[in-house]
């Protein structure tokens, strides 16, 4: 299905010279029952800028922006040691399935933006075609 206006959000961080030093992307995870769930991927920060909190600041900013858009849950797939710093917790696929087979199931993470506990969502979601490649999962 074609991408809708509110299906994709991109945020960037720039240095003092307006050069991009970090970026994040949130895209809609489409479930059969129309849940309002987004996927955070990828998160990228220029090597020179690692360890300065840019990725965390971008993620926090993006999560707040999605909250104002009525997004209820954000998922991501990665290192719990990093993503737990911005509120993500591990979740198993019995509660929310990933769009593709996970090579590292411990890296499937979720965050509620409503303050409510995350309840199970039925059905397998689809993601953007650009990341619907098993190599990323």
Q: Which residues are covered by each model-predicted region?
A:
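Conserved active-site alpha-helix within GNAT-family acetyltransferase domains
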Residues: 68-72, 78-103
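C-terminal "cap" of GNAT-fold acetyltransferases
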Residues: 97-137
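Non-catalytic interaction surface on structured domains
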Residues: 6, 17, 21, 46-54, ...
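Conserved acetyl-CoA-binding loop-helix of GNAT-fold acetyltransferases
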Residues: 40, 45, 51-64, 75-76
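A conserved beta-turn-beta hairpin within the catalytic core of GNAT-like acetyltransferases
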Residues: 29-40, 50
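Short loop segments at secondary-structure junctions
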Residues: 15-18, 48, 112-117
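Active-site rim helix/loop that mediates acceptor-substrate recognition in acyltransferases
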Residues: 1-25, 29
